[in-house]
Amino acid sequence: ADKIDADLHQMIVAVEPKREHFACFGSWVLNRTLAIMIQYLLLGMELQLFSTHEYHYLFWYLEYLFNWQATCLSRATELLQSHETALEQKSGKSGKKSKKKKRASEKYIQEHQAMKQFYHGMRNMCSGYMKALEGFLLCGKICHPAEQFDSERMRFEHRFFPFQTLDTPQPRLFTQYQENLTLTMSHIAKETHLFRLSARSFQQAKTIFEGLSNVPQKLDELLKVTKTNYVVMKLAAGGHKNDSQ
């Protein structure tokens, strides 16, 4: 895709020196790659292929991917707007055809904006789950395998091995995950603070989902999850059933 974009850029510049080809093919491939990576992890959860003690780095990686998705859509919107501006400058007038094309591009831009908000909502959901799991980890409610029979690095690298062949997005490393978790846990003294942060993230996700209407994903189910998790985390932050397992 990058080679096609580069070749098209050279062809367009040869004909119109003041115009450049925008990296639309590379952006499209990146968008589809991210969608497949996200689906790969979500299907693994749906099929219950992961243990509870693995969920934290799964949501950590998903948050990273959803952030990339939102950035990719922002880039696509910028490319579309730049393309429309270039066409308008070239035509110098707006007839019925150009107005019709403009309406079509505006529709795509609105769809991109809605999906970008959706991905921000999913990022907040992942952040909420991460903070909740960190809280449960801090108070000892998540069981890990015995150290002599377990290697967290090996599990991490095994789970995300299919992503290691990609250049973009840059694969996340176990050392990055470990540094992130250590930094978080060293600054938090009580799990209730993490539960409050988790509740805040779920509330932000709920607010975003409530403002969406033209997104194909099942918003009703996501809203139900965010509302339920928000209430549960608020109760946990208040010490409700703190002694339960």
Q: PLM features: residue spans?
A:
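Extended alpha-helical scaffold/coiled-coil
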Residues: 1-245
